[in-house]
From Swiss-Prot:
Main location: membrane
Source organism superkingdom: Bacteria
Pfam family, one: ATP-synt_I
Signal peptide: none
GO aspect biological process, one term: proton transmembrane transport
Protein name stated in the entry: ATP synthase protein I
Transmembrane annotation, as ranges: 16-36, 38-58, 74-94, 107-127
Keyword field: Cell membrane, CF(0), Hydrogen ion transport, Ion transport, Membrane, Transmembrane, Transmembrane helix, Transport
Source organism of the structure: Alkalihalophilus pseudofirmus (strain ATCC BAA-2126 / JCM 17055 / OF4) (Bacillus pseudofirmus)
Name of the encoding gene: atpI
Function: A possible function for this protein is to guide the assembly of the membrane sector of the ATPase enzyme complex.
Family: Belongs to the bacterial AtpI family.
Length: 133
């Protein structure tokens, strides 16, 4: 299996997990009284997943450019740099939104939602390591 298809498989797996969690957060928001909590987790995880998808997409673009035998354009590498800036701005904007709207979003739970994608990735790596042993 090539590295790109492995990357695509991981992204597909993470997408399924995140979409399931987002569905649960929306369901919790609609069916319980914990609206601020579920909406905060939803906002944080949504932005975090968007950041992960941006990283995946730019890695794909840069990988395709690196595989080509001809002279490389600098544009994909510049876009990858801007991708980092975009990810930081997205995370800061959702935290800022939580700070200015404390009755709608809880800042700590938004940050926990942003961090949740990293927990998913670490657990996936742990399960993969345990399967190989």
């Amino acid at each position: 299996m090539s590295k790109m298809s492995s990357l695509q498989g991981k992204m597909r797996q993470h997408t399924i997990i995140v979409m399931t969690l987002l569905f649960l957060f929306i369901t919790g928001y609609l069916l319980t009284q914990l609206k601020v909590q579920f909406l905060s987790f939803f906002a944080g995880l949504s932005v975090s997943f968007l950041n992960l998808w941006t990283t995946y997409y730019l890695a794909k673009v840069v990988g395709k450019v690196a595989d080509q035998k001809r002279k490389h354009s600098v544009l994909p590498f510049i876009l990858a740099g801007f991708g980092y800036l975009i990810r930081i701005v997205l995370a800061l904007s959702v935290v800022y939104w939580a700070l200015i709207n404390p009755d709608t979003l809880n800042v700590l739970l938004v940050i926990a939602g942003i961090s949740l994608i990293y927990a998913i990735i670490m657990l996936d790596m742990l399960f993969q390591f345990m399967r190989k042993r």
